[in-house]
Amino acid sequence: MKFTQIPSDTFSHLQLNAGLMLRDFDPKTATLKGTDIMGATSGGVEFKAKPSYTDFGEDIDNCPANMKELKRLDSIEVTMSGTLVTATAEVVRQLVGAADVDPKDLTHVVPRNDLTEADFMDVWWVGDYSDKNGDKNGGFLAIHMENALSTGGFSLKSDNKKKGQMDFELTAHYSMDAPDRVPYEVYVKAGTDEKAGA
């Protein structure tokens, strides 16, 4: 059938597998450091960048809804959510949001009633992309969230003969230092063939 088809290069443009949450990532080198992995997830990760608009023409006579010249972008809510199944004291601190790790006891996470600059963090999600996924030249799709804060709170659900699960939601935040900068960016890089000896 004429219109029951898919692009011939579909496999070259698929995002594959669950990906990783990272504390840091350089898209220029695409080097993965094990110490940057935040933890193991279950069920993948969901990222959303949801814009909020105002239609200034909605109360104007004879103006149809969604007139593009009268539409204005108010803000963009940027979130990442999922479920972690591994925990360290530092990860729990980040999930609590406003909290510290006790410097005298690095196993002790102490919640606070106020926010500090240290509660906001940059977070990367990076997943395999394209049909070329070798160790050196593999493609990737990467999302960088800036000034992310845990807004979903800290939760732990345990179950008999199962792994404990910690649901999370992170929200990226604008900054007064750069109020026009939307607090996320996306990189889409196709992989290339692995060369012998490269």
Predicted regions and their residues:
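Short helix-loop boundary/capping segments
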Residues: 90-145
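Generic "edge-of-domain/loop-turn" microfeature
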Residues: 52-54, 89, 132-134, 150, ...
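Ordered hydrophobic segments in well-structured contexts
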Residues: 4, 12-24, 122-128, 137-144, ...
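Solvent-exposed edge beta-strands and adjacent loop segments
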Residues: 1-92, 147-165
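Mixed-charge, glycine-accented linear interaction segment located at domain edges/termini
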Residues: 140-198
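Beta-strand secondary-structure signal
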Residues: 79-83, 122-126, 167-171
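Short, surface-exposed, polar/charged, turn-prone segments marking secondary-structure boundaries
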Residues: 75-77, 108-113, 171-176
